[in-house]
Amino acid sequence: MREHQDMATHNKFGKWGEDTAVDYLHKQGYTIRERGWRHGKFEIDIIALSPDGITCVFVEVKTRRSDEVALPSDAVDEKKMRNLGIAADVYVKMFDIQEELRFDVISILGSTAENMQIEHLEDAFNPVLL
């Protein structure tokens, strides 16, 4: 029972992080196209259109309560980057995306709006080069 509660808390915290990232992107002028887009076992947290309208941005959101163990962005390892690239490739083909493509990471450190820090790493990686 305890493990189920811990997972529920973890999922709720992750959703809070994604909601926070969406709010942040809106304030920066991005248009959100998709949230939690899935294809098979692959998922993209946020798919957005850049403020200038020329770039389709695939965003991985990582949230941590503290940086005692590691920074949130450290959780985006090579496997995660590759999987995000595979999912993005499917999305681009499925929806005939013509814009330029970019892969970003939004790192949220903290557990409330009052104590959080947001770091937006634009063009954080290129899955083709992995």
Short names for language-model regions:
Residues 28-29, 40-44, 101:
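Short beta-strand or tight-loop elements
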Residues 85-95:
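Metal-dependent nuclease catalytic cores in nucleic-acid-processing enzymes
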Residues 1-36, 114:
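Acidic-basic catalytic patches of nuclease active cores, encompassing PD-(D/E)XK
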Residues 25, 44-48, 53-67, 84:
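Conserved catalytic cores of phosphodiester-cleaving nucleases, focusing on short active-site segments
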Residues 37-38, 49-53, 97, 110-113:
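Short polar/acidic secondary-structure junctions
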Residues 41, 56-58, 100, 118:
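Structural motif
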Residues 94-130:
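Domain-level recognition of nuclease-like catalytic cores that cleave nucleotide substrates
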Residues 65-86:
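Mg2+/Mn2+-dependent nuclease catalytic core
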